[in-house]
């Protein structure tokens, strides 16, 4: 029987009784105090007492004996409101009579004169004579509610902790410093800068210092220097303060204290109030340690929030109540690290301001007293039914979706310019410091702590004094730098540990020289001694403006949570829902920040705004912000910096050409065709001229600074953030020197610094500086920076993706986990949140919202954006929302301060839990703060200034171009009331004014009516609508939007694009309807400005049977540019959609509305908001119809993806032959038009084999056939159905592994975008089964076969020799050990189990070695790239080609010669292996074999791989060897992977046993005439060697006719040096390739389909022989090129 049923029965009996005795029950109107009464809904209601039901005792005579309850406490307590409330309710019990002892009596009268009572409620407070109360209890022997003797213990924190420990209750680690003890061992204290040692126990800061007396509330918390130092001093509340921050960092020297670890509690404390062992009321309040500001409600009471305790906490509450023998007892809980700790026991105390608690408490106490005393006093009282706990009443969900998770990645706020100075030092004092901090172990030291910086400062002062007293040449040379070192270290008067750092690096042979500002007085021939390079870094601190931005953004963020716009329950502020959520533990908030001070302070300021905190940032930082560098989450020291440097090198070389950018230059600099970069290139024209102009402007600026510095009127002027004229001059002088190098070239890497500095000075110092050309310098620097900064993260999409994945893989993994945990959570564990009785305005009290905020620097924002943009999340062709989003991102020129990417996960509990519509994901992005200056716009079509949304901000554009009028305010579309509503705009500076006032200004220079008539309305896609937009709905939405756009395209073709204001209103009443792309001349603009958003898609492998669903799931890759959330407001949908996200986001971009920001013009706005704090642009919704499954699989692919490749997912193994899965291919962006053009065919070789997985091969063949027939030619019309049928007929001939390689290498094909004219067709040649050879796998009995190859070659129109572009390739350093190698592993990782805790550490991706520096060339011909570029709709003429496919029969003699596993190892491999083992001796003596035809002693691998001695053939498997070694190395997590018994050689049959497998690991392109990678001399490579097997594995007699053609198909691709002009498609850069970042093996979470054992690895990577064509069909045109084609035609082989 349930409690409810019992209660119901009990009530029925009582009511019948009342009806029988109406005369008795009528006069008694008192409330009955019983637990578990029922409300009208049939739910058990703990708190409803006024239900008209009387106490059972109503039948008794009112004259019978009563229980006398004596209240013995100080008057201040007995007269307090909570006590009065409870006593009033207790007095309503018929059998209870209350007697309150007067304070005078208690203090002055002997206990004999005190009133007598049956039950004593007595408790200690300041001034209370506890000993008299004990004496009274012994005299009268009443029933004592709270044990009096134990109240002595409660007054001593040492005893409290001892009792808690004895009961097994968790408490913080602590130690007692007892200065009163005679034993010196009890008061040993050693204090250091960042820790104290108490009686031998060390406490690192932050720690807590508590007086041993519980009556002393002066508790101090000490902070570490890394967070700014100082301490927070807590005290009993005085007014609205409960603590204050103090800069004092030293502990107190008098008195006895308890020292304990500080527990990070996310800023809230839980206060628990027991009433007996079975009842506990808990509430949360803001921790006094956070900011010391007491939150009070409108009545001035401290705001507290009810909390539901979890099971373990209820047990703690019971234990505390019983251990201290206090029926009524309060104690403090800290929830930290997943546990609950008791940190204080307060004894008798009541909850304030909770009527519900007063009811409960009086009921429980009354019943407890009566139950105890009525039997002895013979009172006829029957015990009512009781419930231990109030039941949980879940609220109904309704139609709104429930927000479950918010993940945001946010860049830090406005900062001072970062500055750096290097100086070479040799003084012994520096070496002493270096040694002291273990510099010789690592080769470098980082000094950040105040004490360390003080030591460096002391040395600098000492050396400077030495210089002045006695000249010393070595020191003198550095005087200016030492002076600067001293000035910087003395700058703020104190060291806080977050704004300066010194690094020292050991240079055994002195320091290599760099730019002109380096100290370079040493002669070149001077003998060099070891030295230290001292690098001083300062600046880069968060400015006050940055703090305001972050705080305001935090405040805005509140509004996206449930109840954010609802009624104001407590403080009347916006975003209240979040504050309640947080304080009631329904908000699971974690804030991570990388370790830079500016990032941490941004995070703290954001938390301050988000949670409405006050006070200093240091305490908030310590409690709320977790450092993400402990787990490498936001670490910047990742390997991809090496590859970034190589990309930078290529970019910088391209920017050194002293000529206007040619078409080729543009294609090389901006292969992704980003609109913002195109725009900047148009402005810059000649990069050298532009740099020269910038240099001149900087010199002028320096001249002005020197004048102002000496001018008596201005020399004392205070610059922003306390900077002096001297410091400003030093800053600009260093930039000026560094920018212009000794060779008279410009150092392009300084452009970001120049832009940084001028942006800072223009925003903060222009009023003092008054430099007339500041804006001009800003504009030039910005345009240069718009090219340099984004392209330093890679030029091509593949480079960008590779570098991006290298930087943000750990973060992606964490985000994936954040989203996943919401689905998997166990309900029981989360029952510790909001009491449902208080859940007004919150969707469901038992659930919680997970918020994860990651604050980081620009690199992570860029990387995450790149991964979203190019990783293949959605398809720009089929997904209209995504196309618009990508367009928008392409226009974003800069990821400014406070840029954000936000992912929001919603759940619809009404949907089936397994349905894809259950969880719904939205993706938002903001480019951060606005630029700080209005600037001229380059003339040209499509540019139109936009409004700031505020008439007062109207600024005229200084533009001579008539089509560039002054700023045009937002159009007022008077046709629609809804639209008028949507035009409300506000700025941050106007938050206090009426934001809903419309600000419409007249048009300037435009016929507004004409514009309006051309406008059309598209319904915005509402965010947070009443149902999930997913499945077919998303497709319909996109289709509808498309049709609307299409219907208006023609008339808008010539029209200029309007731009929305960057500001949107914050108020929930203002829902601006934004219409960004409505007036966009979609087809026209696209045609003029092709933007190849090349997104390399991850194939979703879903059944094509459900066409619409599958196409939806395969939408293309995310362009997620991180941007600032506009602090000021956001817009986007009608009021009937009002949900938690209401008015927070703009859906302008995806809904195709006219107010979407058009960032192409890079317009900046005048400062608005807080003085000179520019406002933040709104979060634009990139997509609001994503399914969680889609996003999850995308993140999984990105985490597992091999660098440089798009992670193409493979089709699921084992579906039947008649289901052909649709596999999405790489899609080059964009438009709805496709040209299909016939061209001459190119030849393709397909070698079918049996798949070694047996029966699976047929089904996967279907998939791959479809891959080649459909994804490569998606737009072939019906005339090509014959082709498809003929392909279908051959599907059995397609081996899984071949096309797997094709899928894996898909990404390289995207490079086709680099040249407009490519003739591509495909000819598929079959082979008979006769040509199939087999492989003997290790430890297998059966012969299973594997092999085959798919090749493409490209025939260019000019016939200038083939080209090969490996977009991001491998570093060729011979001295790089394998451990350090980062190549690209091509194993598809889908089959491995996911290990959530796996770390991305082990190197799995080796580099390939070469004898020479390769050129970067363009390759569509390598076997591994076994696919032609896909046919996609595109408005870019470069992609307007068709790909006819011709199937021809190949004869069996095309079988290729085979390489056996026991063939000799090439010397290159040998060298690599010996390097890996650190055994240099092994490498010697191998070199000579390269010039002969065979390898002699190169067969040694590692002792544990038992390969036979040299044979007649070359083992061309180094790629797989290294891949295999590194893979096993990473899977075993050991330095060297092999156990000698793991891999045993099985004797092989003959060479004919294998088929050659020809898949390049990467196209390594070698210079002409150099020795081949795979062990052949140049002569042999050119075919001059008479016998044996050539480098390509072709018999000598057949080599000559085939080499030319195959050179393009299989080789390292004829280099550009062989022909005078680069071939179309070639990207020729002389730098070496970019190495990919190190990747670890991460296991997939799908079913385990392949065991990752040694056999599998060995077979998969090591024993698959390389393959080359014996005879290949070729055109006569190929032979013509034979004489030109002089480069080696061997390619590193690998099996995908």
Swiss-Prot record:
Localization per Swiss-Prot or TrEMBL: Cytoplasm, Cytosol
Similarity remark: Belongs to the histidine acid phosphatase family. VIP1 subfamily.
Role: Bifunctional inositol kinase that acts in concert with the IP6K kinases to synthesize the diphosphate group-containing inositol pyrophosphates diphosphoinositol pentakisphosphate, PP-InsP5, and bis-diphosphoinositol tetrakisphosphate, (PP)2-InsP4. PP-InsP5 and (PP)2-InsP4, also respectively called InsP7 and InsP8, may regulate a variety of cellular processes, including apoptosis, vesicle trafficking, cytoskeletal dynamics, and exocytosis. Phosphorylates inositol hexakisphosphate (InsP6) at position 1 to produce PP-InsP5 which is in turn phosphorylated by IP6Ks to produce (PP)2-InsP4.
One GO biological process term: inositol metabolic process
Protein name (database record): Inositol hexakisphosphate and diphosphoinositol-pentakisphosphate kinase
Major place of residence: cytoplasm
Residue ranges with Low complexity bias: 14-29
Top EC category: transferase
InterPro entries, A to Z: Acid_Pase_AS, His_Pase_clade-2, His_Pase_VIP1, His_PPase_superfam, VIP1_N
UniProt feature, compositional bias: Polar residues: 953-963
GO cellular component, one term: cytosol
Entry's EC annotation: 2.7.4.24
Pfam families: His_Phos_2, PPIP5K2_N
GO MF annotations in UniProt: 5-diphosphoinositol pentakisphosphate 1-kinase activity; ATP binding; inositol hexakisphosphate 1-kinase activity; inositol hexakisphosphate 5-kinase activity; inositol hexakisphosphate kinase activity; inositol-1,3,4,5,6-pentakisphosphate kinase activity
Record-listed ATP binding positions: 157, 210, 217, 236, 260-263, 269-271, 287, 332, 344-346
Catalytic reactions on record: 1D-myo-inositol hexakisphosphate + ATP = 1-diphospho-1D-myo-inositol 2,3,4,5,6-pentakisphosphate + ADP; 5-diphospho-1D-myo-inositol 1,2,3,4,6-pentakisphosphate + ATP + H(+) = 1,5-bis(diphospho)-1D-myo-inositol 2,3,4,6-tetrakisphosphate + ADP
